[in-house]
Amino acid sequence: MLSEESGYLVQVELDVQDCFFESFPEAAQASGYMDSQVSPATWQDWFHRWLEILDSSLPPAPSYEIGLRLTDDTEIQAINAQYRQQNKPTDVLAFAALEVDLPQNPEMVAEPLYLGDIVVSINTAQRQAGQQEHSLSTELAWLTAHGLLHLLGWDHPDEESLIAMLQQQVVLLEAIGININVNY
């Protein structure tokens, strides 16, 4: 059903925490992050569009909740060490709140469904954007789309599943007007 207030088929409640800017405003300014910063309204729009595309893989719910935390290499390294036993920074982490085959009872279907949290390192995203020769905002969209797919049960334990996931990320970015070249 199309929501009159937003014009979207799928409703999403997004909590964006820009810890990178809040913790390091001078570094954010010096690094050019401020010029590439994605507004909360833009993130909200992107997630709406992405979830509409991925609607067939969503459990039924009146709306979906997602947390997005933008941080630095130091914090993401600590999180990576704590939860994945990898004591090094990474680009994106996703913490799914649901098991993929979780049975849904009627009470669960009536409430907003919390999908999980995505954590992105701005430092790593900046490096990767430079290596890929595209903007920081493009890299942030790419990494966040990757995290969203993980929240929905996608994984890439082998080359074939990685290629399928990367192809889906390309589709998601095209939906928000970002064209990206990926070498599979």
Swiss-Prot record:
Its main location: cytoplasm. Gene3D superfamilies: Metalloproteases ('zincins'), catalytic domain. Keywords: Cytoplasm, Endonuclease, Hydrolase, Metal-binding, Nuclease, Ribosome biogenesis, rRNA processing, Zinc. One of its GO terms (biological process) is rRNA processing. Pfam families: YbeY. Zn(2+) binds at residues 146, 150, 156. Its cofactor is Zn(2+). It is found in: Cytoplasm. Its EC number is 3.1.-.-. It comes from the Bacteria. Binds 1 zinc ion. The keyword Nuclease applies. The keyword Ribosomal protein does not apply. One of its GO terms (molecular function) is metalloendopeptidase activity. Belongs to the endoribonuclease YbeY family. Single strand-specific metallo-endoribonuclease involved in late-stage 70S ribosome quality control and in maturation of the 3' terminus of the 16S rRNA. HAMAP family: Endoribonucl_YbeY. This is Endoribonuclease YbeY. It comes from Nostoc sp. (strain PCC 7120 / SAG 25.82 / UTEX 2576).
